Each structure stands twice: as structure tokens, then as C-alpha cells.
Amino acid sequence: MSIIDNRKAYHDYFIEEKYEAGLVLEGWEVKAIRAGRANIKEAYIIVRGEEIFILGMHITPLASASTHIRTDPTRTRKLLLHGAEIARLIGKVERAGFTLVPLDLHYAKGRVKAEIGLAKGKKQYDKREDEKKRDWEREKQRLMRVKA
């Protein structure tokens, strides 16, 4: 079950591969995500050394968040993956012109996980072509309903 989706990522990128990654979160962040107060539309993923981080993910703290903890809604959060997966992703990002984008946040066995995608950017004509295909599929469905 998805908590938050990044539909903009599917519009702007061709998603080649998907990976599930854990997130290093603080307690107040988990509570806020469970309440649906997170946004990953502007988020992006970077590689620093042998580690992968997500930047720009905004988690709005709940009003009941502790007063003696400084809450930073857009702090850099580390992604948890196996070493072999990290090595494979780093290789593709550095060599093949791919980028990493967050696709969604979801639960897996009670934990908050992020689905990240290995993606290539779409050109403007690719986006227009996808929109034409989507419109044609809608029109076909509409015509089928009218005939039936």
C-alpha cells in the first residue's frame, strides 16, 4: 500500500529499474508520514561516497511533535540498500547517464520504505507522445462504452 506517490517522476522520466530502500528516519518523521504529511515531488537522490541520500523530501511535523527536538522538515535522509545494489546503482548513474528518483513511500512489514527508480530523462517530444497515447486510450474506452 502506497503512502505517497511521485506521479511527476513517471511524467518526467523513463523508469528502467525499481528498487526498494529503507529510510533512516526519526520518530516524529515516522508519525508524520503515517499521517500523510510528506511530499516527495521535489525530492531527488544523490550519491556521496558509497552512500545514497534523498534530498528535498519534505515532512511536515505534527503539532504534537516534541518541543525539545529541533524538527527539520527537509533534512537529508540516508537510504538503506545492500552493498551490491548500491555499487550497481552508482555504476549506472556515473557511466550510463541514468539518475535516481524517488517513486513512492510505502509500508513493508510495518516499516516505511522508499521505492526508488533508475531513470533516464524524457525529452519534450517524448512527453507529448505519451500524452497522445494516453488521450487515445481514453478515447477508445469512451467509444467502447458508447457502443455497449
Curated annotation (Swiss-Prot):
Q: Which PROSITE patterns match?
A: SSRP
Question: Which stretches are annotated as coiled coil?
Answer: none
Query: Per its UniProt record, what InterPro entries does this chain match?
Result: SmpB, SsrA-bd_prot, SsrA-bd_prot_CS
Pfam families noted in UniProt = SmpB
Signal sequence segment: none
Q: Which domain of life is it from?
A: Bacteria
Q: Name one GO biological process term.
A: trans-translation
GO cellular component term of the entry, any = cytosol
Cite the entry's keywords alphabetically. Answer: Cytoplasm, RNA-binding
Q: Which GO terms describe its molecular function?
A: RNA binding
The subcellular location is: Cytoplasm
Function in brief: Required for rescue of stalled ribosomes mediated by trans-translation. Binds to transfer-messenger RNA (tmRNA), required for stable association of tmRNA with ribosomes. tmRNA and SmpB together mimic tRNA shape, replacing the anticodon stem-loop with SmpB. tmRNA is encoded by the ssrA gene; the 2 termini fold to resemble tRNA(Ala) and it encodes a 'tag peptide', a short internal open reading frame. During trans-translation Ala-aminoacylated tmRNA acts like a tRNA, entering the A-site of stalled ribosomes, displacing the stalled mRNA.
> Which HAMAP family is this protein grouped with?
SmpB
Q: Which family does it belong to?
A: Belongs to the SmpB family.
What this protein is called in its record is: SsrA-binding protein
Q: Which organism is it from?
A: Azoarcus sp. (strain BH72)
Write the gene name: smpB
